[in-house]
Amino acid sequence: MSPFTDPSRTDAGTDPALDGPDESLRRSLGVGRRRFLSTCTAVAAGAVAAPVLGAAPALAQDRGRGHGHDHGHGHGHDRGQVLVPADKRGIILYTVRDATARDPLASDLPSGFREVFKQLARHGYRQVEFAGYNQHANAPGGASLESVKGAKLLRSWLDDYGLRAQGNHGFIPSSWPLTTEDTETFKKHLEIANILGMDHMGTGGDPTGSSYRADWDVAADKWNALGRIARREGIKLYTHNHDGAYGFLLDGGPLDDQGRPTRSSGIRKLEYFLKVTDPKVVWLEMDIFWAHVAQYKFHSYTAHDGSTRKDVFDPAGLVARNNKRYPLFHAKDGVVSTTNGMGYDMVPFGTGVIDYRTFFSRVGERNYHNPMIEDDNSPSATDPAQSLREAKISYDNLAALRKRC
């Protein structure tokens, strides 16, 4: 992969003997020498290239220690400005979905929305992103809180524990043109979002799974229409990404047997979506983990003329160029994997190699973006306390991030 130049890095060595091609690569990647050399060794030994772009030593601390304060002294990683202010530290509740779904009558662990809110607030979180409004039937409020009454109850608990709802992965109509039924359901979810005090409402899926421009044009028309409805209710509508959405759009070259293009101009799908949607009504939530998977997987394309061209995705660069379009992030981490085809295995935030210090330093606007901790794998069938315990580890590591001086 070709590296991107990272102007935020200032800790590169100055020994002339180290200023060869490998040192230039290391600097541009924003990787410490030890990590760079070990990664290069692993790549040389393996059949599949390991992802190195954005890699950095993990921020994991001893699991018994916390870093929930915004102090700027002490350890080396505490020097400089806090990268994620305390009131911007959030978590998507999908990460602790086993806890909200747990039967409070069968466990002493926090169970249901109210007790989970209480525990997350104790960890230090100030924001949450919903992933639906269902919990265990024995929890206060009952199984479904997807109603005006349920939203008012949820809001009261959020207020009790000093939490703010910042978004939801919820209902996005499947119909297009919109049916009356879907439109009314969508408006009901906007009403719930307003009761909960959300600025944003969205989805956990991509606008479309297609690789073709025509389908992305349809998706843009639909999202523009939905975004206008949401804006009238004071809500910013956002979409999400997995790795495929930052793959390359097929928009030219020879046609296949169904009349579809087979080659690319080099524009990525969600980059095209950014261009053809109205910035006043459509926003995006970057899942930074999946964006790095896309960086690993989609680093070259076949151009219209049949040539192969290299183009390494730069997630932080895309956000920096479109900062106000990305009010939300999913912040989840990964360790290098050369066997799963993605380049990374998910781990709790701060215990992997994705360089969040550099990412947040480069995108800036720390009082605008809302990073939500996510770990798809935190719930455990054998360790019911794991997801909330790892939520604390992730919070501490998010709070520990400091901008380099």
Task: For each feature predicted by the language model, list its residue ranges.
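Active-site acidic/histidine proton-transfer and metal-coordination neighborhood
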Residues: 41-42, 46, 159, 173-283, ...
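Short, acidic/polar
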Residues: 103-120, 179-191, 311-318, 356
